């Protein structure tokens, strides 16, 4: 719980800093922002490499994972689609309900609700002495597939934002090569896996993706550049590693510290939401979401509660499957999937790169904050249900 509360604290500190720093730094702010964004990408790459390291499947039994993958995909898709509909039909005026650009923007932004925080989840269940239970083993598979589905779907969403250009085929080609390499050589790379090496690999991945963008932007112009998000390349790097569990106090402190820095930087990346500067930015916005007028804080909070409820209702998909298990086990499995964290925050940051903003962005960030606040309640709920019906696995 201390880690969850720290996530919340650093995210909130970042949100406060995002409103104060532009005025405090003045003309130096753009340089500071560029440095902070670079650090954020490196932290996100570090997190995704570790998610990839956790992705361990027996390829000889790949058919047995099919049902789990489709359940995880549905568990990621339902909250996403519910929030897309909410953002379109509740937040936007009716004349934009059929606007294709509005749908594209909200399809990308709403994806923050899809991923489950695997790190928070596994730590939580292990601390409850449930590591040998069916719930733990099943949720481990679902949470990883959940994150994988989020990463993969970001590719067509990115293509949707770009439009039907030649870069789309280049991006698809890179994605196909990465997926084939990840599957073909999964867990084959026998490499040192301490936090320094993983952070270094993350920096290399970020440098390569940024270099590709800079070179193609110089050759073809920013509008025709190739921009590969760091999520999938970093995940595949983690997949290639022959997993080694390095559970030392130093490793735990380093990994936790990088996650805290990531949440702080995500908060700091938010645009101004109050004052004349925020109004001017909304008036000059190039996206539909960012051009929407800011709402009163009381109305925003009501939307945050509604979006949080929808995102968690959507995560109840596993209740309707695994009928050979008790209802309490299936409910515990679903509630465990309520936890959100770094990957969802990463999706919000990527959405910012496409100039998305406005009330929908603020609601998304505050929904993540509310979810972190409620994580303690989710822990207690899962504990009661799981210990009531815990079935150890052989």
Question: Locations of the language-model features?
Answer:
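Core mid-bundle transmembrane helix pairs that form the ion/substrate translocation pathway
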Residues: 144, 148-151, 155-261, 393-394
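Membrane-interface alpha-helices at helix entry/exit sites of multi-pass transporters
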Residues: 131-145, 152, 166-170, 249-250, ...
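Small-residue-rich segments of transmembrane alpha-helices in multi-pass membrane proteins
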Residues: 10-17, 70-84, 141-154, 197-213, ...
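Transmembrane alpha-helices that form the ion-translocation and gating core
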Residues: 61-130, 264, 269-388
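N-terminal membrane topogenic signal
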Residues: 1-9, 192-197
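Hydrophobic transmembrane alpha-helices of secondary-active transporters
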Residues: 13-20, 35-63, 158, 207, ...
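Structural signature of hydrophobic alpha-helical transmembrane segments
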Residues: 33-48, 101-117, 165-177, 223-236, ...
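Membrane-interface helix termini and inter-helical loops of multi-pass transporters
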Residues: 22-34, 91-100, 159-167, 215-226, ...
């Amino acid at each position: 719980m201390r880690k969850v509360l720290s996530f919340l604290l650093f995210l909130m500190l970042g949100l406060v800093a995002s409103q104060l720093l532009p005025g405090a730094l003045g003309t130096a702010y753009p340089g500071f922002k560029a440095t902070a964004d670079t650090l954020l990408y490196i932290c996100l790459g570090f997190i995704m490499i570790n998610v990839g390291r956790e992705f361990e499947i027996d390829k000889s039994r790949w058919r047995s994972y099919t049902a789990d993958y489709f359940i995880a995909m549905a568990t990621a898709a339902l909250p996403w689609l519910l929030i897309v509909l909410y953002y379109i039909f509740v937040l936007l005026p009716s004349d934009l309900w059929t606007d294709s650009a509005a749908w594209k923007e909200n399809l990308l932004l709403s994806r923050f609700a899809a991923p489950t925080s695997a790190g928070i989840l596994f730590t939580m269940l292990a601390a409850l002495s449930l590591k040998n239970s069916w719930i733990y083993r099943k949720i481990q598979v679902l949470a990883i597939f959940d994150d994988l589905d989020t990463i993969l779907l970001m590719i067509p969403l990115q293509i949707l934002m770009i439009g039907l250009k030649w870069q789309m085929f280049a991006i698809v080609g890179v994605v196909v090569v990465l997926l084939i390499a990840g599957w073909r050589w999964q867990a084959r790379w026998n490499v040192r896996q301490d936090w320094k090496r993983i952070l270094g690999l993350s920096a290399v991945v970020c440098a390569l993706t940024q270099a590709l963008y800079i070179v193609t932007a110089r050759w073809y112009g920013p509008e025709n550049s190739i921009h590969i998000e760091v999520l999938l390349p970093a995940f595949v790097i983690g997949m290639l590693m022959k997993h080694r569990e390095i559970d030392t106090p130093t490793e735990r402190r380093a990994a936790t510290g990088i996650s805290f820095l990531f949440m702080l930087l995500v908060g700091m990346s938010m645009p101004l939401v109050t004052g004349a500067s925020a109004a001017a930015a909304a008036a000059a916005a190039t996206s539909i979401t960012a051009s929407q007028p800011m709402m009163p804080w009381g109305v925003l909070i009501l939307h945050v509660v509604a979006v949080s409820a929808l995102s968690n209702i959507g995560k109840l998909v596993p209740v309707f499957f695994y009928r050979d298990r008790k209802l309490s086990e299936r409910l515990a499995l679903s509630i465990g999937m309520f936890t959100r964290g770094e990957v969802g925050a990463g999706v919000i940051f990527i959405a910012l790169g496409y100039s998305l903003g406005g009330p929908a962005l603020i609601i998304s960030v505050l929904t993540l904050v509310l979810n972190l606040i409620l994580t303690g309640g989710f822990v207690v709920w899962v504990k009661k249900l799981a210990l009531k019906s815990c079935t150890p696995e052989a």
